[in-house]
UniProtKB/Swiss-Prot annotation:
<comment type="similarity">
    <text>Belongs to the band 7/mec-2 family. Flotillin subfamily.</text>
</comment>
<dbReference type="Pfam" id="PF01145">
    <property type="entry name" value="Band_7"/>
</dbReference>
<comment type="function">
    <text>May act as a scaffolding protein within caveolar membranes, functionally participating in formation of caveolae or caveolae-like vesicles. Required for normal infection threads initiation and elongation and nodulation. Probably involved in polar growth of the infection thread.</text>
</comment>
<dbReference type="InterPro" id="IPR036013">
    <property type="entry name" value="Band_7/SPFH_dom_sf"/>
</dbReference>
<feature type="coiled-coil region">
    <location>
        <begin position="305"/>
        <end position="325"/>
    </location>
</feature>
<dbReference type="InterPro" id="IPR027705">
    <property type="entry name" value="Flotillin_fam"/>
</dbReference>
<keyword id="KW-0175">Coiled coil</keyword>
<keyword id="KW-0536">Nodulation</keyword>
<dbReference type="GO" id="GO:0005886">
    <property type="term" value="C:plasma membrane"/>
</dbReference>
<keyword id="KW-0472">Membrane</keyword>
<dbReference type="GO" id="GO:0005901">
    <property type="term" value="C:caveola"/>
</dbReference>
<dbReference type="InterPro" id="IPR001107">
    <property type="entry name" value="Band_7"/>
</dbReference>
<dbReference type="GO" id="GO:0016324">
    <property type="term" value="C:apical plasma membrane"/>
</dbReference>
<dbReference type="GO" id="GO:0009877">
    <property type="term" value="P:nodulation"/>
</dbReference>
<keyword id="KW-1003">Cell membrane</keyword>
<protein>
    <recommendedName>
        <fullName>Flotillin-like protein 4</fullName>
    </recommendedName>
</protein>
<feature type="coiled-coil region">
    <location>
        <begin position="235"/>
        <end position="255"/>
    </location>
</feature>
Amino acid sequence: MYKVAKASQYLVITGIGIKDIKLAKKAWILPGQSYSVFDLSPVNYTFEVQAMSAEKLPFVLPAVFTIGPRVDDKESLLKYAKLISPHDKLSNHVKELVQGIIEGETRVLAASMTMEEVFRGTKEFKQEVFGKVQLELNQFGLLIYNANVKQLVDVPGHEYFSYLGQKTQMEAANQARVDVSEAKMKGEIGSKLREGQTLQNAAKIDAETKIIAMQRAGEGDKEGIKVRTEVKVFENQREAEVAEANSELAKKKAAWTKAAQVAEVEAAKAVALRDAELQGEVERMNALTTTEKLKAEFLSKASVQYETKVQEANWELYKKQKEAEAILYEKKAEAEAQKALADATFYARTQAAEAELYAKKKEAEGIVTLGNAQGVYLSALLNALGNNYTAVRDFLMINGGMFQEIAKINAEAVRGLEPKISIWTNGGDNSGGEGAMKEVAGVYKMLPPLFKTVHEQTGMLPPAWMGVLPDKNLN
């Protein structure tokens, strides 16, 4: 089933394949999974918080908080989905939760401030409440989008703010009267002051006018003298510049004449120098031609001999390299053969050791299995005989042929001797009951000496159901 949430909603999915919860805008809801939808739009909560200042003065703080999930933080959305989304945003549960946090933080903060501080620092008080409430709401994934704190209101029976307002009004009225009186006083004083200042300023202006007129006349004379002086200086400068220009012109004419003569001499010398250079170039080319000819004659023979020697040396070097490579290859082959032989020997020994280890393990496992089987067998036998250890021991000795083995050993020991043999009989040799019972009597005749011999050699007594030895024999 494919589900899509609206623009202001989220899907909360739980169930198979999801470790905790999953938030999504759209998703497939698989069998074994469940989902719910929660809205992200904020909600307005209006409260009238009753608090008490540090002077134990109660007051009412009307406030409107706009609170909703923090949409820009995935961790906060997960907290909101787990803790708040199962409840309706407008339900009493959510409202009581938010109201409890706001009232608690407001009362704690108000208790640390005086009424005057709360009244005059409403903005700071609001910021403190906002910060502390937001800190508590973070653990539920909620964010305060807006918080409006209205004017503080008196609790019925406590008219602090009304008295404070009356006080402010009276202070304002008194201040207004004082301001009116001060304004009248300032008006009268100002009028007289203005008249005096007018007379003073008129006299001052007359004096300053005379001074300025004399200053202007002196400045005019100084300016005339200054202008005449500057004109004379300018004339002298112009005459000096004309003389300097004439001198420079004469110098330049002399330099130009000298340069022309030098150029003529340099031209003549350059022609002679170029002639000598060309003649030297001709001689050098002749010498190079002769040198190249001699090189061609003598170096050709030397080059041939050099190439021959180089080829012979290269051949000797190549032969020695090949011989060295052959010896190296032979040594490598021998080393690889020895290594292969060592690897084969090591592998054979490893396989033999592993086979022996496997045989020992299997033998040990067989012994363990046999021991377990014998334990089960003895346990079953002991249970069948009513946990009679003596009966189990005798059964095992009889079943294992121990008595026969003991008799055989005793017979071997007394072979060739004349042992004393006791024979018990019932004294009825000539009675008419001979026949089948005779064989049974013979068996019973054999048992007493066998039991006695076993007792003498091992100290073990026969079971009660097979007979009892006389006391004299035991002693």
